[in-house]
Amino acid sequence: MNLNKIRKFFRESHIFFRDFLNKRFPPYNVEQPIPETEEFTLINADANLASLTENVLPNFPIDVVFTWVDNTDKAWQEQYYRTLQPIDQEDIGLYATDPARFSNHNELFYSVQAVQKFMPWVRNIFIVTADQKPKWLDENIHSKIKLINHSQLIDAKYLPTFNSHVIEANLYKIPDLSEHFIYFNDDVFVARPLMPNHFFENNGLASLFVANKSFQKMRQRGLITPTLTASEHALKLLKRHYPTININTPLVHTYVPLRKTSFQKAWSLFEDEINSFLNNKVRHNSELNMASFLIPWLMYLDGYATPKREICYYFNIRSSHAQTQYKKLLFEKEHLHMPHSFCINDSSSNNADKNYALHFRNFMDTYFEIETE
């Protein structure tokens, strides 16, 4: 080792040890087995490969669907607490009534902005709501955006509902919905320009964003959420029709490419089981996770989906770790090394950073270059 290198080592020893540790113990930001150091290389490689077939067949329309609630709406609050009062708490799933599940930090505004900015090829953006309208939405300006009320999709005898599983089970009934669509929760944000073939191949094959997790390990950790049990129940139904399958894996917490005809097939196969939970006003442990488990895996088993890479940063808005992730995402944006997406989840109000909402807004305004008054 020459003298200059020795001097550099002592002058920048922190960089040396950082790089050493990163090589020895590479950091992981995502739910797939992809170390941070390889994220950008893999995103570029995938995009270059996909571009080779993007014009083989004519493009087909692709819509985006959001589900959203405004928990600050007084009428919604009154209806929610009136509906919740007679329900036996023992029947309700973990976090199902936690205020964080319905908290509104204007996520929808930022998520829609991201779709419009980074996915301009989307045909329609449907927002499914409980007869609510975002304050920022001017439909004369946002002509692609269409509001859909629960009453347009769900039988009146099941309304009102505050159960995302019930709402998701009926998404395929959206009027004028395209065969190929992408389902978003409003806590998922597109982080970079994405082409249609990130979601659907040119021949219509959907992307299946499989997570590097297992139901068994999730249960061992002890957090038995309604999403976990609803996915396990859905898996039992899939095994009834595909008895040789061995699925033990959820999907990445991000957007989900879906097909309307696969929804229709699921209803034809499992109508009784779906109808059995539609009257649950909030999430219980006896339901089906259709939009982010049953339908995507049904598509895969029928040959309509294939596993794909999805680099999505996933963290909780209320945790102290969120600020670290905000800084990392802004740094990566500055250097054009952004992930595909990020999900800033808000499922539990426990142990919250007291300034979490302010940190979130400041980050989002900066990342998406939103001018504030």
UniProtKB/Swiss-Prot annotation:
It is an enzyme of class 2 (transferase). Coiled coil: none annotated. Keywords: Exopolysaccharide synthesis, Transferase. GO terms for biological process: polysaccharide biosynthetic process. The keyword Membrane does not apply. Transmembrane segments: none annotated. Its EC number is 2.7.-.-. One of its GO terms (molecular function) is transferase activity, transferring phosphorus-containing groups. It holds the Pfam family Stealth_CR2. Part of a capsule gene locus. Expression was not detected under standard growth conditions. Stealth proteins are part of a protein family that is conserved from bacteria to higher eukaryotes. Family members were first identified in microbes as proteins that help pathogens to elude the host innate immune system. Microbial stealth proteins are involved in the biosynthesis of exopolysaccharides. Stealth proteins are predicted to function as hexose-1-phosphoryltransferases. Belongs to the stealth family. PANTHER family: N-ACETYLGLUCOSAMINE-1-PHOSPHOTRANSFERASE SUBUNITS ALPHA_BETA, PTHR24045. This is Capsular polysaccharide phosphotransferase. It comes from Neisseria meningitidis serogroup B.
